[in-house]
Swiss-Prot record:
The entry's keywords: Acyltransferase, Cytoplasm, Lipid A biosynthesis, Lipid biosynthesis, Lipid metabolism, Repeat, Transferase
Entry-linked Gene3D superfamilies: Hexapeptide repeat proteins, Udp N-acetylglucosamine O-acyltransferase, C-terminal domain
Gene, per the UniProt record: lpxA
Protein family membership: Belongs to the transferase hexapeptide repeat family. LpxA subfamily.
Enzyme class: transferase
GO molecular function: acyl-[acyl-carrier-protein]-UDP-N-acetylglucosamine O-acyltransferase activity
Record-given protein name: Acyl-[acyl-carrier-protein]--UDP-N-acetylglucosamine O-acyltransferase
Source organism superkingdom: Bacteria
Subunit: Homotrimer.
Task of the protein: Involved in the biosynthesis of lipid A, a phosphorylated glycolipid that anchors the lipopolysaccharide to the outer membrane of the cell.
Organism of this sequence: Alkalilimnicola ehrlichii (strain ATCC BAA-1101 / DSM 17681 / MLHE-1)
Length: 258
């Protein structure tokens, strides 16, 4: 059964599925869809067009689906889409997209977004991502599955964070972070393969060994990046992880942290 606290304000056009709960002093605007089993705590503001999937947990004072923080934005109907089973903690801000980039900000499933974090317009987040407190993305940032951003990590617009990457506390990231790697510092620099994280996700020694080999090729061999990439592509024909690394590098517009 859907339960809406009498002190909440829910627009009549908002669509709340079965089992949704809405806490006191929360405001849900028009053109909002909330999936079954989602719990929206007190003092939350959700503006549309926004779609939330099933079984999300929205904690107090989160701002979901407000206008993009872009001076060019002129009120166009852009969107925010959030998948299933996400945890969005206190004071998180998730902004809608802008028309210049297709009008969509998207979060996938099972992400853990801790207090005071910010996801700006047109960002695309995959699944199983963790943001520690006050991690912030500028606009147009892509974050792949299983990435972790430490507290107060800051990511420049148009950067990409690769799958299973770990970005340390306070990192300032102005270029793409390769999948499977760790970076930290101001300005952030790479520090090797994310061995601890990969082991926690069940990756075996041989798989990690091959990734370390690829890391040495890219960062320690002294080769030009184009030459290292060609060699990595050959290795990737028999290794999906290395194939993903090569494709990630080839698709980079801002360049990689190196």
């Amino acid at each position: 059964m859907t339960r809406i606290d009498p002190k909440a304000v829910v627009d009549p056009s908002a669509e709340l599925d079965e089992g949704v709960t809405v806490g006191p002093f929360t405001v849900i605007g028009p053109d909002v869809q909330v999936g079954a089993g989602t719990r929206v705590g007190p003092h939350v503001v959700i503006n549309g067009p926004t779609r939330l999937g099933r079984n999300n947990r929205i904690h107090p004072f989160a701002s979901i689906g407000d206008d993009p923080q872009d001076k060019k934005y002129a009120g166009e109907p852009t969107r925010l889409e959030i998948g299933d089973d996400n945890v969005i903690r206190e004071y998180v801000t998730l902004n809608r997209g802008t028309p210049e980039a297709g009008g969509l900000t998207r979060l996938g499933d099972r992400n853990w977004i801790m207090a005071y974090s910010h996801v700006a317009h047109d960002c695309r987040l995959g699944n199983d991502i963790t943001f520690a407190n006050s991690a912030s993305l500028a606009g147009h940032v892509d974050v792949e599955d299983h990435a972790i951003l430490g507290g107060f990590a800051l990511v420049h617009q148009f950067c990409r964070i690769g799958a299973y990457a770990f970005c340390g506390f306070g990192s300032v990231i102005n270029r793409d972070v390769l999948p499977f790697t760790t970076v930290s510092g101001h300005m952030a620099q790479p520090h090797g393969i994310n061995v601890v994280g990969l082991r926690r996700h069940g990756m075996g020694p041989e798989r990690i060994r091959e990734l370390k080999r690829a890391y040495r090729l890219i960062f320690k061999s002294g080769k030009r990046l184009d030459d290292a990439l060609e060699e990595l592509r050959l290795l990737g024909k028999e290794n999906p992880d290395l194939e993903h690394l090569a494709a990630f590098i080839a698709a980079s517009n801002r360049g990689i942290l190196r």
